[in-house]
């Protein structure tokens, strides 16, 4: 029975992690429209932030070398608590504190059964946009691709 509970918890953690990844990539417009579309908004209280800071980005040459400090990246984060008790966290690259706050709100709403469907709809919308952007970039890259080949020259 413990294994089934652990598997369920692991699936929930993975689902929330994927949701937080999508929220970090969502635009301010997408987040704002989704927030405005919610009718029964709970009260939101800040726990931390939103705040902006720096994190050290680490890298490895070839994926197998020793790690080294590549440089610093600006990040924004926020933590909020809903009036219904859920706590949400939002982290993203850049300095957009409003996006970090909204991402934290949607992370908290995702934990609420009453709002999960609207948050999942936002996740799907962001995922569709990201997939379209990836396809467009792949098509642009394919258009500039150069195929090299070697011709065997006969002896004269």
Curated annotation (Swiss-Prot):
Cross-referenced Pfam families: PhnG (PF06754)
Keywords carried by this UniProt record: Plasmid, Transferase
Molecular function as annotated in GO: alpha-D-ribose 1-methylphosphonate 5-triphosphate synthase activity
Coiled coil: none
Keyword flag Cell wall biogenesis/degradation: no
EC number(s) recorded for this UniProt protein: 2.7.8.37
GO biological process entries: organic phosphonate metabolic process; organic phosphonate transport
Catalytic activity of the protein: methylphosphonate + ATP = alpha-D-ribose 1-methylphosphonate 5-triphosphate + adenine
Family from the record: Belongs to the PhnG family.
Biological function: Together with PhnH, PhnI and PhnL is required for the transfer of the ribose triphosphate moiety from ATP to methyl phosphonate.
Protein name, as recorded: Alpha-D-ribose 1-methylphosphonate 5-triphosphate synthase subunit PhnG
Gene: phnG
